[in-house]
Amino acid sequence: MKSVTIENHLESLTESSVIWERYTRDAKINPNRYFVFYEGEDRQYYDCRIQQYTETYNTYAVGGKSKVLKLFEKFTQEGESTLANKLFFIDKDYEHHQVNPDIYMTPKYAVENFYVSSTAIKRILKVHFGINDDDPEFGRVLKYFNERHREFIDYLTEMNLWAICCQLNGVKIDFDLLGLKNNADNILKVKYKKLELSVEDISFYYFERKYGEKLREKSESGLEKNGRDYTAELSYFMDKKEYIRSTFANDVEEYRSCIENYFRGKQLLWFLKEFILSVENKSGGILQKQFFIEDRNIMTVFTNCADTPE
């Protein structure tokens, strides 16, 4: 039986059924408002953009993509007119096609991707560091950022292609097992002058092998988390291995050619944070420290500097 913890309680508050109850209550009081539904903490990105068009809206942080889609389905079952003043936002993740024209899906993996680009770093330098684009520091930082960003993408391209191939074959990767859900600290260190790899191999087959090892460790330990059967997961992963390899060998060029659209957003956001901390470093840095950033506040701090796709 699932134990009751603070984490479980907070998770329950984002369940589709709970959000539906909140919405129906709010809609009775203010039926003419806009009602906005999105994944987790994405409000940090969307809210300031929605405010450009209206101040009269309610927002609801639904747990994840599947829960947003479940909620959308419930609205459509109630009748098409119920979508009139509703906005739904989801991340693209590794999806290749639009899920539904009535749902906004990011053109890149997640909203975090909009924070990490040459245009975004230019805004960050101007707005948060007060550096003009004709100042020498501006050009230096921009040059290093573009170089390190390109290297970061290149280093982790095969990791993302491996995950895409897995998903195309019905295997959804748990990046927590690899210690890579929110960053890439297990693989490399970010310095503004260079990226330092912590492992010798970052190929498709490295991630395939490491993931199998992690599943096997969990299976042999007999540990289960929330009823998760690691033995069954390992068996399924091994059964799919050759199909996944075949997909990688024959069917990924379309993804590879635009890999930045399928690149894990949280890892990119971590890269941005580490890069900025490096250029602010007292020993050999370029810029003076202006503010405190960490994983929990970086989206809020830089939200006005992030790209806004058309």
Question: Residue locations for each model-derived region?
Answer:
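Acidic, divalent-metal-binding catalytic cores of TOPRIM
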Residues: M1-E310
